[in-house]
Amino acid sequence: RHRSFEQMRRASIGRDDDERRRLVRAMFQSIGMNSLEWLHSTGWSDERVMEHIEFPEHEPGEAERAAGNGQINITAHMGNWEIFPRAYGIHTRRRLMILMAPQRSPKLNDWIVRTRSRGFELVMTEEGALKPLRTLRRGDIVALLADQDSTRNPGIFVDFFARPAYTPSGPAHLAYRTGAAILPMVIM
């Protein structure tokens, strides 16, 4: 919580420290709620998933998919990022590959892989770029969380709220090598 509070202060988010504390509390409550929703949804049918998720009438990527081009979806740890890829794959009727960094705990990693991999292919980032390249060249979708400050993967530092933040370069390399569009997405 302290780190989140300090980051909000540096970014001038909130009128004062009291408001920042309320925002941090609300953020952690939201993460808890999203986690419970995800756990609850793991047994849902595709139809039930789509009863709870709406997509805009004209959403980004429609033209790319219609042309048969690959698509790179980038999201962040916002909203229910765990439910989104499954719903998006159902919505687009396209094969979806998720790139995932392995967790430190093998037991947690195995559990996450089992629960996340329903309805799409899950590939560990350490496996390299060959599978994502093939997926994009087939005209399918690769999705990843790009807001993690991890120097395990190639990237560069860019200023974010006046501080250097590590930004992975993998999505740009995949787009360059395949011509796939990069689409930022979020579920709210």
Protein language model annotation of sequence segments:
Residues 16, 67-127, 138, 149-163:
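Catalytic core of membrane glycerolipid acyltransferases/transacylases, capturing the structured
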Residues 17, 55-58, 126-130, 168:
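Structural motif corresponding to alpha-helix initiation and N-cap regions
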Residues 21, 102, 188:
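Residue-level "edge-of-site" marker
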Residues 60, 84, 111, 128-131, ...:
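Short, hydrophobic/aromatic alpha-helical segments in well-folded domains
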Residues 62-63, 88, 133-134:
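Short secondary-structure boundary/capping segments
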Residues 127-188:
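Membrane-associated lipid acylation/remodeling enzymes share a hydrophobic transmembrane-juxtamembrane segment
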